[in-house]
Amino acid sequence: MWLFVMFDLPTVTKMEKKLSARFRKELEKDGFIMYQYSVYIRYCASLESAHVHIKRVKSSTPQKGVVSILMVTDKQYSNIINIWGEIHHKKVSTPLQLEFF
């Protein structure tokens, strides 16, 4: 079973940014990995394990914003269709090598 945590947290003030970052760190600490920018996923071996992690997400959720949790079976997860567009990375220029005689 897979847990998807999707969230939209305010990040206008310094405090809101801090709380949003703390929430992300708590998700990562609990074994979630970033699937998309505001979507984190985690595999759970059982329903009981999923409920434990749902409790942890609830306890670390900031008071403002929206957090949604979706439970997906392995079969449903295997049917996900990912469409990857071109990813642009900043090209790092190769430094010039100096020759000394």
Language model features by range: what are they?
Residues 2-4, 9-101:
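Basic nucleic-acid-binding interfaces
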